[in-house]
């Protein structure tokens, strides 16, 4: 690669490689605007103080703090670890089928599942 054509080609390759990594950035998932509305729609009917899901497990999704407290059996969200987070396992159908969530309702939309999974992988921030 000598001469002006070789130099231009090398420069074009370097520029293309630099922009290849910039084209697709992972979106930042926000608890308040992305996750909480899904939990309110699909989970809050059962998982709030005094309701069946809460009575059975101790899990309330009424607030960030209550969600992060988890159940009387342990946490359901492990920040940064969606594979081990019980919440993600349940909504993806990877747990015991008898406790599929939402219980007795249709599954979450794939986009909603991906949003919750991404939020957990981003550290499950209260944002």
List where the protein language model places each region:
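Bacterial N-terminal signal peptides
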Residues: 8-18
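Aromatic- and Gly/Pro-enriched helix-to-coil junctions and flexible linker segments
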Residues: 22-127
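N-terminal secretory signal peptides that target proteins for export/translocation
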Residues: 1-6
């Amino acid at each position: 690669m000598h001469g002006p054509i070789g130099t231009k080609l090398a420069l074009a390759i370097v520029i293309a490689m630099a922009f290849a990594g910039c084209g697709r950035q992972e979106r930042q998932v926000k608890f308040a605007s992305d996750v909480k509305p899904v939990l309110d729609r699909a989970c809050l009917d059962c998982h709030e103080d005094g309701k069946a899901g809460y009575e059975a497990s101790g899990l309330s999704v009424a607030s960030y703090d209550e969600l992060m407290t988890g159940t009387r059996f342990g946490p359901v969200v492990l920040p940064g670890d969606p594979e081990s987070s019980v919440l993600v396992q349940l909504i993806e159908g990877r747990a015991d089928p008898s406790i599929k969530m939402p219980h007795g309702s249709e599954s979450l939309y794939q986009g909603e599942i991906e949003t919750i999974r991404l939020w957990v992988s981003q550290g499950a921030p209260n944002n």
